[in-house]
Every structure is written in C-alpha cells, then in structure tokens.
Amino acid sequence: MLPTSVSWSLYLKTFRSHLLRAPQIVLKRMSSSIDISKINSWNKEFQSDLTHQLATTVLKNYNADDALLNKTRLQKQDNRVFNTVVSTDSTPVTNQKSSGRCWLFAATNQLRLNVLSELNLKEFELSQAYLFFYDKLEKANYFLDQIVSSADQDIDSRLVQYLLAAPTEDGGQYSMFLNLVKKYGLIPKDLYGDLPYSTTASRKWNSLLTTKLREFAETLRTALKERSADDSIIVTLREQMQREIFRLMSLFMDIPPVQPNEQFTWEYVDKDKKIHTIKSTPLEFASKYAKLDPSTPVSLINDPRHPYGKLIKIDRLGNVLGGDAVIYLNVDNETLSKLVVKRLQNNKAVFFGSHTPKFMDKKTGVMDIELWNYPAIGYNLPQQKASRIRYHESLMTHAMLITGCHVDETSKLPLRYRVENSWGKDSGKDGLYVMTQKYFEEYCFQIVVDINELPKELASKFTSGKEEPIVLPIWDPMGALAK
C-alpha cells in the first residue's frame, strides 16, 4: 500500500535511510528482470486493442512524423500575420549548412539589420567565417588553459573527461560572440566568405583539431606532474601548441585578410544603385556600421529549476581568455515575452536560444508543441519544463532570431512570433518560421536584450555587484548551445 500524502515525506526519509544502511540488499529487492511470459501477456493485451491495431498498422507503413502530423492544427498555426515587426527585411536568407555556427549566424543576422539600414542596402551579410576562424583559434587556447587549471583533478574526473570530449566544437553563446567582436571586430562577407570543406562542413576539421588537442592535453598534464616543470616550461609548451594549432587551421582556411585594427576597403552598391567605397577597420566597422556596443547586451533565461531573479553562471564556459563569462538572469516566461515585444517595438530583432528541432515542422516552418498527435497512439508527454531539463530531455541546442510577433490587443501578450532561421531558404517558408507562444514558453530558454531595455530592478542585478550568481557546471543543459 502506498503511503498517504500526509506521511509521504516521512516515508521518503525512511526509504532513503534504508538505502544508505543496506543499499545492495534494497537494490536487489527492487531489481526486475524481463519476464518472457509477461511479454506474451502484454502482446495479447495490446493486440486486442483496436486503437493499438490501427496505430501499429499506420506506423509500420508510414513515416511517423507524416502520419501523426495534425494538419488541422498546422493550418491553424501557420499564420504569417504579425502586427509588430522590425522595419528592415533581413536578406538574403543565410545558411550555416553542415556546421554548428547557429549562434554566429543569429548574432550577425541581428547586427546586419543595422548595416542594411545604415548603408541603404538591399542585401548584406557579415562574415561568419571571419569570427569562426578566430573562435576556433581562441577555443583551442581556452581548452589548453582549462587543462592546466584542472591538472589537479584525476584524468577520469567528470570535469576532465567533459573537457576532453569536445575541445573545440562549433557551438557558442552570445557572450562568446561578444568576446570575439570586442577583440576582432566584424567585416563584410564579401571580403571573407565560407569554404566548402571547413566552415560549411566542419566535421573533419574538428576531428583533426580534437585529436591534436587531446595529445596536447596529455603533454601538459604530464609536464605539470613533473617537479621540474616550472611556469616558463608550461608557457613555452603552450606557445608551441598555439603555433601548431594555427598551422593546422591555415591548412583548412585562408587567414583573414585584415587584422582587427588594420584598414580594409569595401565597395558596394546601395538600393538606389549608387556605388560607394568604405575604408574601415574590423573594430570600427562593428561599432560604426553594425552599431554594436558590447557593453549593453545581456542574456536572460527561463530555467524553472532555479529561483527567478537570480543570476546564473556557467562555470568554465568560454572562448577568449580574459573574456566575459557566460552569465544569465533567470526570469519567468511572462517577463521574457514582454521584453521580446518591447525590443521589437523598438525596431530591434531578438537573439534567442531554444531546443531545436523539438516540435518543429521544417517543411512548413511551424513551431508548435501540439503539431503531432502523439496522444492518438497512447504516447503522452507529462513532464514539465524543469523536469525535462533535469532529466536531459530539454536543453538549449539552437540559436535563431525573432524579427516579429503578433500581440493580442486585449492581453497585450504575444500569440506568435516570426523567426528567422539560418538553414537556407528551403527550410521553413523561405527560411522563416512561425513560433507559437506555448512553444516559446516550453522550449525557448534564452533571449538577449540591451540592459537599458530592462526594468531597473532587473538591470541592477547585472550592475550592482552585489549579486552572487548560482554557478552551474560546464555540462549543464543551459550551456549546451556552446556544444
């Protein structure tokens, strides 16, 4: 008999104490091997159910995504009318292809709206490859630094094993984007475009870099264990490793054509077909034309595992040594939604991080948690957002851009959002998606706004210096966008 709600806490306490006293005995009692006779019984039970028979007939003959797609729901949610949109069209549709650069695309797509407006352009892209090159170089060096700082931990520790698992993946966070732009600036894509076997298809390149970095990790850990390995020896080793990583990178990518403070010349034709010439440095281009002030953007998340109104920091996550840490302010969904609307009303697009491609129909470009009729086959999804995060069912995997929303006239809250993706024009409807409010609440985790767009009580969390952040480990789902 199960305990009543009144005695439930006492029951759990007693249960845990039994586990601690005799874990092997208790676990043995709770073990349950598969009973073949029960399989036959279960099969008879399910096969006698007409609903189960219909479901299995359909799923054995058709693709599950196609068969369970609720087309009535799809048609209802595929509404492309938005009463709050940014004034500048973001063209052309970008395509990250077979790379994990979504964060760089979402961030540069946001800033290119400023360039399009400032220079009266019809089409424009910032060079994602320029930032990608330096991100790889910086991440490799950041990894080596993490190996040195964790040298006191056992090689089999969770931290060291996590660091070794993927030293220099393509992913990243908005604060990591800011770290790159502050150091290297921005340039037009016309000056430094993608390459087919490195930037747009990075798997092999990543594999070779990873192998070399793991070798370097062993070298550093071995040297640090030797008493004779003073600081100068480690620094010399690090410089040799940096040189070799740069050499490997130069095999796969051209070196960026200009240094951050070096002047480049860019010619372009505006909407009126007038020819212009710009002379600028990458750092100047970022501030003057892309209108980026790196001190103003802040990240907010909705993570119901932790108290709202608290700062959250992802430990050890970064790319540029000495750069800003990954820090968010945790708020409720209503606050996130209102900030998105406010920013769009100020004619600014919103960088956001979500769990993609959960409940996303790539053919039509609709993101809605009720698109697929899973209950029709007896498959229900009762877990709440906090539980999904805890049990690794939800995590931040993809960054995109919100460029519009439709606000209800009565509640003043958004009903749906216009989303710009970076998977090319054949994904969604010409590269654009519509996201429902319910999807936003369940599978959107992060947005980026300017600190002056926050209410004073929220802005002060970032500026007061009195807030101690909740520190989450580098492998936490809230850091997964950087994978």
From Swiss-Prot:
InterPro entries registered for this protein in UniProt: Papain-like_cys_pep_sf (IPR038765), Pept_cys_AS (IPR000169), Pept_his_AS (IPR025660), Peptidase_C1B (IPR004134)
Domain of life of the organism encoding this protein: Eukaryota
Top-level EC class as recorded in UniProt: hydrolase
Localisation: Mitochondrion; Cytoplasm
Catalytic residues of the enzyme: 102, 398, 421
Protein activity control: Inhibited by E64, a specific inhibitor of cysteine proteases, N-ethylmaleimide, iodacetamide, and mercury and zinc ions.
Cleaved signal peptide residues: none
EC number: 3.4.22.40
GO CC annotation terms, alphabetical: mitochondrion
Xref: Gene3D superfamilies: Cysteine proteinases
Residue positions assigned to the propeptide: 483
Post-translational modification: The N-terminus of isoform Cytoplasmic is blocked.
Transmembrane segments: none
A Gene Ontology biological process term: homocysteine catabolic process
GO molecular function: cysteine-type aminopeptidase activity; cysteine-type endopeptidase activity; DNA binding
Transit peptide location on this chain: 1-30
Functional summary from the UniProt entry: The normal physiological role of the enzyme is unknown, but it is not essential for the viability of yeast cells. Has aminopeptidase activity, shortening substrate peptides sequentially by 1 amino acid. Has bleomycin hydrolase activity, which can protect the cell from the toxic effects of bleomycin. Has homocysteine-thiolactonase activity, protecting the cell against homocysteine toxicity. Acts as a repressor in the GAL4 regulatory system, but this does not require either the peptidase or nucleic acid-binding activities.
Record protein name field: Cysteine proteinase 1, mitochondrial
Gene transcribed to yield this protein: LAP3
